[in-house]
Amino acid sequence: MKASVLITLAVLGVMFVWASAAELEERGSDQRDSPAWLKSMERIFQSEERECRKMFGGCSVDSDCCAHLGCKPTLKYCAWDGTFGK
């Protein structure tokens, strides 16, 4: 009786280690590939031309900022210009 319980526990332990190793191997390949994937996504977003800069976005002139935002001359960021409307 004791021997069968020990054998069962040993088999379960081996199966657990085997399954964990297989899962770690799958995740490892994803983690190695993810930096390249993130870099390609970063290039895509950097290459897009944006219509305007949103609140606190960097700017050089007022026309860089979205509607109702103006470029603050001292720190060069888009902030509310005090106007309302559509």
Swiss-Prot record:
Q: Mainly resides where?
A: secreted
One GO cellular component term, please give it.
extracellular region
Output the superkingdom of the source species: Eukaryota
| Chain positions with Phenylalanine amide modification | 84
Expression by tissue, per the entry, reads: Expressed by the venom gland.
**Transmembrane residue ranges:** none
Task: Tell me the keywords, alphabetical order.
Answer: Amidation, Disulfide bond, Ion channel impairing toxin, Knottin, Potassium channel impairing toxin, Secreted, Signal, Toxin, Voltage-gated potassium channel impairing toxin, Voltage-gated sodium channel impairing toxin
The record's subcellular location field reads: Secreted
Enumerate the SUPFAM superfamilies for this protein: omega toxin-like
Disulfide bridge partners, by residue number: 52-66, 59-71, 65-78
Cite the propeptide residues by number. Answer: 22-50
Q: What biological function has been recorded for the protein in this entry?
A: This toxin acts as a voltage-dependent gating-modifier. It inhibits the sodium conductance (IC(50)=124 nM) and slows the fast inactivation (EC(50)=1180 nM) of Nav1.5/SCN5A. It significantly shifts the activation to more depolarized voltages and decreases the deactivation of Nav1.5 currents upon extreme depolarization, but only slightly affects voltage-dependence of steady-state inactivation. In addition, this toxin causes an approximately five-fold decrease in the rate of recovery from inactivation and an approximately 1.9-fold reduction in the closed-state inactivation rate.
Any additional notes? Answer: Negative results: does not show effect on Kv1.1/KCNA1, Kv1.2/KCNA2, Kv1.3/KCNA3, Kv1.4/KCNA4, Kv3.1/KCNC1 (all expressed in oocytes), voltage-gated sodium channels (Nav1) (from DRG neurons), and in a range of voltage-gated calcium channels (expressed in rat DRG neurons). In addition, does not show significant toxic symptoms when injected into mice and into cockroaches.
Q: Which family does it belong to?
A: Belongs to the neurotoxin 10 (Hwtx-1) family. 28 (Jztx-11) subfamily.
Under which name does UniProt file this protein? Kappa-theraphotoxin-Cg1a 4
Q: What is the lineage of its organism?
A: Eukaryota, Metazoa, Ecdysozoa, Arthropoda, Chelicerata
